[in-house]
């Protein structure tokens, strides 16, 4: 059955569906904003509809951190904006460096009124999975973060309760803290489980723990002998 909150939203016109970003180690970051449109009716964009972006220029928690702002006219369902953060501080796994996180907020404006908003955090880091041939039958793998090879010390993460709806943030925090204390720097989210609560991913960001995310149904009984299924 349904085990999470059920919410009913009443909107007059538009809302922000999703915000995601791409950032590089030189401080360039692009935010992509998906805005909901009602395509069942004539729904033209008015001149006073804009997106207001607010981005921190220093990591969260740093005193006297400034902010960068940009107003962009709404262009449709897909929108984007570019920012440059001078001298960005890079995110590292625990044991290799700090975990600076920057903040952002996106507001959908109708005139001067905030119709909808979304906010979150982001980081600057590069990730490479390098494949290095070591022989005819052996292929070596190396995980590289910000140009530095990382020795991965990991563990599986399975649903922590049979009834997932009763799990509280405090239990996530306790188990992740124990993993960090055990010198673990990566958790593999098991493909036979669930997509975990956002809190798990956010707290791992803070603690420097990387996530290896399996696709769900990875351990399902897939009918590999069914030609039509495989070809689909």
Language-model segment annotations:
Residues 177-179, 186-231:
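Aromatic-lined substrate-binding rim segments of carbohydrate-active enzymes
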């Amino acid at each position: 059955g349904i085990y999470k909150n059920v919410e009913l939203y009443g909107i007059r016109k538009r809302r922000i569906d999703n915000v995601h970003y791409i950032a590089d180690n030189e401080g360039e970051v692009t935010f992509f904003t998906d805005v909901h449109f009602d395509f069942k009716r004539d729904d033209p964009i008015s001149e006073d509809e804009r997106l207001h972006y607010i981005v921190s220029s220093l990591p969260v928690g740093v005193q006297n951190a400034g902010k960068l702002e940009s107003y962009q006219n709404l262009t449709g369902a897909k929108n984007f904006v570019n920012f440059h953060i001078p001298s960005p501080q890079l995110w590292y796994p625990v044991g290799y460096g700090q975990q600076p996180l920057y903040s952002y907020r996106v507001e959908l404006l109708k005139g001067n009124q905030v119709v909808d908003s979304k906010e979150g955090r982001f980081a600057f880091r590069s990730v490479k999975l390098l494949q290095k041939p070591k022989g005819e039958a052996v292929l070596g793998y190396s995980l590289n973060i910000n140009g530095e090879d990382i020795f991965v010390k990991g563990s599986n993460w399975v649903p922590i309760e049979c009834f997932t709806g009763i799990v509280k943030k405090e239990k996530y925090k306790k188990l992740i803290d124990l993993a960090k204390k055990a010198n673990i720097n990566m958790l593999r989210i098991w493909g036979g489980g669930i997509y975990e609560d956002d809190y798990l991913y956010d707290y791992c960001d803070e603690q420097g723990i990387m996530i290896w995310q399996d696709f769900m149904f990875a351990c399902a009984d897939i009918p590999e002998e069914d030609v039509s299924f495989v070809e689909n």
